[in-house]
Design a protein with these regions (language model features):
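Rossmann-fold cofactor-recognition segment
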Residues: 115-127
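N-terminal Rossmann NAD(P)H-binding glycine-rich loop of SDR-like oxidoreductase domains
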Residues: 66-69, 73-94
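Mid/C-terminal beta-alpha module of Rossmann-like enzyme folds, strongest
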Residues: 280-375
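NAD(P)-dependent short-chain dehydrogenase/reductase
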Residues: 202-283, 297-311
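Conserved Rossmann-fold NAD(P)-dependent oxidoreductase catalytic core, especially the SDR/UDP-sugar
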Residues: 157-160, 164, 168-208, 225-226
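NAD(P)H-binding glycine-rich loop region in Rossmannoid oxidoreductase-like domains
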Residues: 125-164, 197-198
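Non-catalytic terminal and boundary segments that flank Rossmann-like NAD(P)-dependent oxidoreductase
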Residues: 1-73, 405-464
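Conserved glycine-rich Rossmann-like NAD(P)H-binding loop of the short-chain dehydrogenase/reductase
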Residues: 96-109
Length: 464
């Protein structure tokens, strides 16, 4: 069966660039039907592969949360977005005094309320004065920061917009939290992509940079900062919506490649995570929360075949390759193989050593690994001054690189040894048809952090 898979995949790769040719199109159709038949035999297309994900719920200790929120003013940035609006509609169920939404989108498709406690301020988090005035006027007690530019592909072609929104906009929010004496906690929505040890993809880099900003202010400021790491959000999934629409209206459905898997969660889980952070934030430490039980990842090709089968249209699937923002290869050393039964894509090995689990065993709590205040402050200063698309990406990535180097100097060296062993042993590289250089700058950075130590002797043979 595996050989048959590979033969079909290989042929689809060969034919995909020629999809406009009638003969190639017809053969792609036949190959797609063959794949659907194979997946059907395995019982993989009988229902939406994400059905169980949509139905999942997390524990939410409402009495304890209400004790925290009672009589408070909550400010939600991006409160007219998918997660933000759902959060607002959940907050009204608690005994809060007022909910302020700060959002630039005057034409949102999401609805909030109606509820007399909700007030909307239209403004952009990139505008420091708007942020300052909003905080000064409403004096929030709790800030939920969900506003962001969230499209990884868009981020690669709109670098300044993404960096100024995600990084400098977050900096505006954090600074406003510090100078507004009423603020007790600030909760930030991050991404599982920030668990990467290092990344050169713009969207993921901005979120990882932000996590370090919150870690910095948790140590220097007076406010408690917490975070959630979201994975693929089904309720506003760019991938899922594109596959569905193309299956209904286009003459083919494109997927990046076979063997590309995504973990996912729903907006109810997302909001429950953010509310749970209220109970797990600590002074001096930026904790993050993730869903513990994410289930097995779903293949994007499987989703495409499911939608084609569902529409009963005679159209093929094609492989389009990985676009910008989705090109980095998954590194096996990202996950903690000391306990294979507890693997989770949203937390890396260093962070996993600090993990705790809530009483209901459905949420993992950990914290980011600090780099050092001066390193982060220097990276922020450079990013605040830079202009231009190319220059902004260079400063973003170089700043993040220095932050990561600082982190590698502080972490347990044996953990770095374990990471390199789990990720770079030849038997694992052979399975992935990969080499160490495929994983980018993080590999030489890790080796460099071990040089001159006894730990280096344990891994030097892995350098190839």
């Amino acid at each position: 069966m595996e050989t048959k898979y590979n033969e079909i995949h290989k042929r689809i790769w060969e034919l995909s660039p020629r999809i406009k040719c009638p003969e190639a199109y017809e053969e792609l159709n036949l190959l797609t039907k063959e794949l659907i038949h194979i997946y059907d035999l395995q019982g993989r297309l009988t229902e939406d592969p994400f059905n169980s994900t949509r139905a999942r719920k997390l524990s939410q200790p409402n009495e304890r949360i209400n004790d925290v929120l009672k009589g408070s003013t909550c400010l939600v940035t991006g409160g007219l977005g998918c997660v933000g609006s759902h959060l607002v509609n959940e907050l009204v169920k608690f005994d809060v005094f007022r909910i302020i939404i700060l959002d630039k989108n005057k034409n949102s498709s999401y609805t909030v309320g109606p509820d007399p406690s909700i007030e909307i301020v239209y403004g952009d988090i990139r505008d420091a004065q708007v942020v300052h005035d909003t905080f000064t006027k409403y004096k929030p007690d709790f800030v939920f920061h969900t506003a962001a530019q969230r499209d990884p592909g868009y981020a690669e072609t709109h670098i300044v917009e993404t960096v100024t929104t995600n990084v400098l906009g977050t900096l505006n929010i954090v600074k406003a939290c510090e100078y507004t004496g009423s603020v007790k906690q600030c909760i930030f929505s991050s991404t599982g992509k920030a668990s990467r040890y290092f990344t050169e993809e713009v969207y993921a880099a901005t979120k990882k940079f932000c996590e370090n900003i919150l870690d910095l202010y948790s140590k220097l400021g007076r406010v408690k900062y917490g975070m959630v790491r979201f994975t693929h959000m089904l309720d506003n999934s760019l991938m899922n919506e594109q596959l569905r629409i193309h299956s209904e209206f286009e003459n083919h459905v494109g997927v990046h490649s076979p063997g590309k898997y995504v973990t996912a969660q729903n907006k109810n889980e997302a909001v429950s995570l953010m509310l749970n952070v209220l109970l797990y934030s600590e002074v001096g430490q930026a904790n993050f929360l993730i869903v513990k039980n994410l289930e097995w990842p779903v293949e994007s090709l499987e989703m495409a075949l499911y939608y084609i089968k569902k529409t009963r249209r005679n159209i093929p699937v094609v492989f389009i390759g990985n676009p910008l923002g989705y090109t980095e290869k998954f590194f096996r050393g990202q996950m903690d193989w000391s306990n294979p039964c507890e693997l989770n894509l949203l937390i890396n090995v260093y962070e996993n050593k600090f993990r705790k689990v809530n009483d209901d065993d459905d949420v993992v709590v950990s914290h980011v690994c600090s780099s050092g205040n001066k390193v982060v402050e220097k990276a922020i200063c450079k990013l605040e001054r830079v202009k231009g698309e190319v220059e902004t990406k260079i400063v973003l990535i170089n700043g993040l690189k220095e932050i990561v180097k600082g982190t590698l100097e502080k972490v347990n060296k044996q953990h770095t040894v374990d990471i390199l062993n789990w990720g770079l042993q030849q038997k694992f590289l052979d399975v992935e048809n990969a080499k160490a250089s495929d994983y980018g700058a993080i590999i030489p950075m890790m080796f460099g952090s071990l040089e001159g130590s006894a730990h280096y002797e344990q891994v030097k043979n892995l350098k190839g």
